[in-house]
Amino acid sequence: MGTDGLVGVVTRAFVVGILELGSIGVALADTTILNVSYDSTRTLYKEFNAAFAEKWERDTGETVTIQTSHGGSGKQARLVIDGLEADVVTLALEADVDAIAAATGKIPANWKSRLPNNSAPYTSTIVFLVRKGNPKGIRDWGDLTKEGIQIIAPNPKTSGGARWNFLAAWAWARAANNGDEAKAREYVAQLFKHVLVLDTGAWGAMTTFVQRGFGDVLLTWENEAYLALEELGPRNFEIVTPSISIKAEPPVALIDGNVDNKGTRKVAEAYLNYLYSDVGQKIVAKHYYRPYRPELADPQDIARFADLKMVTIDEFGGWQEAQRKFFDTGGIFDEIYMPRR
């Protein structure tokens, strides 16, 4: 995705997880804030940062520089825990924000209740990206374990999107087997035997599939799949929407301990609140996320989203239970995944 300048913000993309600095002259900025985000929000925040910087200067007479950092959500959370002084985080799942809160004490336990919709201004889901013509005939989750199918996906240990992938696959298998958890486990174990490359984040997985040409199918965020079509054209790829997926709810949160130390609370709070504004919700939908308030978005942007059955994290007991059961050290993912040799 390009590095062309935007109003108020010019983004320079570096290695995944490294800072992307947005400014038109840092020396001119009254305030600088850092948004630590996950892989799939790059184009979203490129435009949103520009819109917010323009509004902030118009409303206050002050300029603001917005820095962004992107990478696998779990890795990003670890960077903040290890001392990266984020003003806000916009991560892939609440378990990563909870991990920061527990490890640092810089976010209050009630952080989810401070913004609407449990602090999720947008949602997404998991879909399949296949090559043009769908040569392997992939229509649903059951097709992914057929002989010869090669899957590209990110790693649940480092990527939030990968954890949503895992749970969506589990939900389908559980439903297909009348709620049988053992059968669901068996299916997901078989699915991961078909994973050719397990990248650290969604961005890396997309690159492996789209640019390097590996694999028959990519398990990916819905917005990433649409971006691939936008950037590379529908002549190369197709989106397959499975019969069941999951409602992915990426949350946003203020890092109270950091903003109070840096004196940036006012601008950081305004930044997160602006995601819920009519402008913010339009930008969210434009970049293929499902806005919390779809009535504020352009109707043509909403119309492109497929109607599908989506389970929620509540069906797994919430993120705390899902993280413990599936993704923590010694959890089900560790038990079933055997890296290719």
Predicted regions mapped to residue ranges:
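Extracellular/periplasmic catalytic domains that process cell-envelope and extracellular macromolecules
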Residues: 82-83, 119-123, 132, 143-146, ...
